[in-house]
Structure formats: structure tokens, C-alpha cells
């Protein structure tokens, strides 16, 4: 594995009902600190349905770029579609760091992604 291909700090920005969760904004702050130390950028991963309008708020809280995956099957959290969508982002973008909040959703999603990526 060529680690030089991996760069940038990615944050899973959890939203429910079209409202960003506080943990997403908190993680963007931490991601900004990490990215600054590594001379990299912060990418927010936003999944859901009709959520693109939340991108501006994510940029205002420290995201350099926002990757939006908008699909009706992502309107409410379900394990497999969210896991697959983020796994595809990770495979394509090759982030050096991925931050996921320690919420109920994050505790379901994080280990599944870790198992698929490794």
C-alpha cells in the first residue's frame, strides 16, 4: 500500500431530518486542527435525501469541501446503504483520516467501515 496516495481529513457529518447534529460540527473543528498540522484539507461527507442545502453550514464550520451523497434510500439511517456509500467514498478519495462521532449511528457505522477498509 502506497501511503502517499492517502491525504485529507474526512468527517462523516451526521444529520437527522435535514438538521446537522452537533457532533458533526464538533468533529469539523477537530478535523480542521488535524488537517492544519498535516497541511491537508477537510472534507465533509454528507449523506441523506435533499440535504445539499446543509453544505453551506458545513463550510462555515470548517469544511474545505463537501461531498454530498443524495438518495432517497439515505433519507433515514440504515446500516448497509450508509456503510456502502461511505466505503465507496473512502475507496475513491483515499483519506488519510476519517472521523465519525461516537453516537448511536457512529458506533454502528464506524466498526463496519473499519472492517471493510482493512
Give the residues covered by each predicted segment.
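N-terminal glycine-rich FAD/FM-binding segment characteristic of electron-transfer flavoproteins
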Residues: 1-117
